[in-house]
Amino acid sequence: MGKLVALVLLGVGLSLVGEMFLAFRERVNASREVEPVEPENCHLIEELESGSEDIDILPSGLAFISSGLKYPGMPNFAPDEPGKIFLMDLNEQNPRAQALEISGGFDKELFNPHGISIFIDKDNTVYLYVVNHPHMKSTVEIFKFEEQQRSLVYLKTIKHELLKSVNDIVVLGPEQFYATRDHYFTNSLLSFFEMILDLRWTYVLFYSPREVKVVAKGFCSANGITVSADQKYVYVADVAAKNIHIMEKHDNWDLTQLKVIQLGTLVDNLTVDPATGDILAGCHPNPMKLLNYNPEDPPGSEVLRIQNVLSEKPRVSTVYANNGSVLQGTSVASVYHGKILIGTVFHKTLYCEL
């Protein structure tokens, strides 16, 4: 009798899991395909073959690119190679990417870079903050950029018990930043069920040497984060919920949600067009192809522009869309003077002149 009860309970449990998985597939638009939107003047960057998960561009046009991310459940074309930070000068007629040398005693063999953020100090010194996943844990690395030598000098590693499963950061002061946590569980299997169950246990935290605190919570999977040009508002992408949260920043660093913009596609990293204040979002139109990678039927790419962010009816338009024949798994798009760099989690990088 006990075995029969156990079998019945197992059957009920498996049935519930199956129903939840089907609901998850529907929730994330698993079978969605995109109509192509491709600017005419585009080409792939030869030097970037192992992803360009995040991109941040200085006002001078120098673009920093994180490459080589190894992330649970995602493809990787160079699993034995450590990650790198690349630099591109978008002022050049035919910009190329070069890997930046890192000095200062940093363990480059364990470098697994994810989200990045630039901070320019009052004396114009440029610092690069990098989310790193050595041994699949989460730290934030601080580097100083040496422009003449085109290199990075390692300064410091930040660790904290709240800095777990960190995805992205945006730096607003010396060692002062917001960071997103994309999964509550760090175990791959548990984090998978976390998404299926739509638990919404992830959050945004604020870090400073004096204070570390959760400032926004209730996200399914808090992902990309950036700040408005005037630094009054913080934008947070909830990738599995397919939306962007518009948050007001207060003097004590707390955040208050003003609105949520639904996009109907899985939103990864966010950047702001410095010329217009528009949000650019790198998106995943068909995530199941990303999780179950098949080179014969690859995941597509999508970049959206969100205009009039604070208005009652923001305008959403497609900047780029491809079925995976050119670019797979778009994670970010960043613009500079009519030029756009489109990065991916594990694939190539596209440069276009708009």
Curated annotation (Swiss-Prot):
Its EC number is 3.1.1.2, 3.1.1.81, 3.1.8.1. The signal sequence is not cleaved. Glycans are attached at residues 29, 269, 323. GO terms for molecular function: acyl-L-homoserine-lactone lactonohydrolase activity; aryldialkylphosphatase activity; arylesterase activity; metal ion binding; protein homodimerization activity. SUPFAM superfamilies: Calcium-dependent phosphotriesterase. GO terms for biological process: carboxylic acid catabolic process; establishment of localization in cell; lactone catabolic process; negative regulation of superoxide anion generation; regulation of cellular response to drug; renal sodium ion transport; response to toxic substance. It catalyses: a phenyl acetate + H2O = a phenol + acetate + H(+); An aryl dialkyl phosphate + H2O = dialkyl phosphate + an aryl alcohol; an N-acyl-L-homoserine lactone + H2O = an N-acyl-L-homoserine + H(+). It is found in: Secreted, Extracellular space. This is Serum paraoxonase/lactonase 3. It comes from Homo sapiens.
